[in-house]
Amino acid sequence: MDANRREFLKGAGLLAAAACGGGATAAAVPETGAADYATDVLVVGGGPAGVCAAIAAARNGARVLVVEQSGMLGGMATQGLVGPFMTCYDKSGETMIIRGLFEEIVERLVARGGALHPRGVFGNGPYSAWIPKGHDHVTPFDPEALKVLLDEMCAEAGVKVLFHTTFVEPVLDGWRAAGARLFGKGGFRRVSAKIVGDATGDGDYAYRAGVPCTLGDGNGRLMPATMFFHICNIDSDRLIADIEANRHTFHKKDGVSYRGFHWYVTKAIAAGEWDLPRRCLNMYRGVGPDVWLVNNGRIPGVDATDSESLSRAEVEGRRQTKVMMDFLHKYVPGCEHAVLMSTGSTVGIRETRHVAGEATLRVEDVLNGVVPADSILLAANSVDVHGGKDNPMVSSYRTINANWYGVSYRCLVAKGVENLLLAGRCLSGEPAAAGAVRVMPPCMAMGQAAGTAAALALQGGVTPRALDASKLVATLRAQKAFLG
């Protein structure tokens, strides 16, 4: 049996053990021999959180390797076509509070015509799908421009990026994260690292390293997935006029939203032409001429930690896209000749694992504006939970009772495994609290904080758990993060 075959069987067996148990079985196997790559900081996942973690760590002096299973950085923003960036302002709408790397990315996109600055984008308009709550000062952007910019920023910072490379399992030294086993076009590879950042969204590294995790709400329920798609060749003036003429009919009943084009959806349902879980169609105007983003499909029962479930979701997402395109062509003024530009190359996922950390973001703290002393970001994003207990049509949207709330650094420090940091929607948080900060601007701020923390820990010769949080907060402030 050749070496690659032995490695494949070994990897498959270990992964099976991890899937059946708590994740520690696979990770507990020590690695011997020289690593294929050696780095200070390994970031697993190149999405919004991961790319910001990588850039921040590198700018603060660390050698950084990013492992990304696709062929691009940006994750949901580029692969998933998720947009716009949700609000980065406080509740009053007066102050931009998610800044730092996020603001730099926005400003560089604006300078090349790839985004609209959020200061000039308001709720109740076409760039926010006419949704007022939580949609003031969103950031429309062009995902193609973002792909190129993120490549440039990683190159400028000296970040090494491995595309088309899948994370297989952690490498642990006892209960210390020490790297990862990977699989790419050249077969299995191993990377040694001093600190690891889990930016997988699903907490894959943490789970397989044995860190306690909760899937969804802990009772088998997860928020539904959505397939985003972009369309063009729209007569935007006619579309906008139709919405404006009917906007007074927007309402919510029994947790179900009746917003854009619900007056046509009712007709399509009666004609047997609409079998989707939502009773409206949410469209966001894009950056290009007469380009629109559709965020409307709901795919219930998707467990994105399971490949079979995720595969079914991709197929269902494209089927739902076809239903909506037919609907647009037949019913919506200005969309008679709409052209489908693209669907997401991956379905949009709102929720999977919540990883246990040294602190837990609690929904009551979010709603009441609690700001821990070691807060590494401030946000005002509302608690946005899609899908009810037994009804994917409903949603729960709760605005906060303060101008902002904070996320503790300890929510990014994984419990029980040293030198492992979390960034993005897999942070340590109650499911409803994570429903507030799962959107991209807070995830990018978490990434900047995690990457900065990793670099500072290495400089100080301490673990991330032992890092003086006041030093981290001071460094983030100096690097243009807004922390009050």
Write out the residue ranges for each language-model feature.
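Flavin (FAD/FMN)-binding glycine-rich loop and adjacent Rossmann-like elements that form
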Residues: 97, 101, 120, 133, ...
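Aromatic pocket-lining residues of Rossmann-like dinucleotide-binding sites
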Residues: 57
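A short, basic/flexible loop-to-alpha-helix module at the beginning of a structural domain
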Residues: 25-37
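N-terminal export signals
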Residues: 2, 7-28
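N-terminal Rossmann-fold NAD(P) dinucleotide-binding loop
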Residues: 50
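Conserved N-terminal/central alpha/beta ligand/cofactor-binding core
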Residues: 11, 62-63, 69-169, 173, ...
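Beta1/beta-strand and adjacent pyrophosphate-binding region of the FAD-binding site
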Residues: 36-47
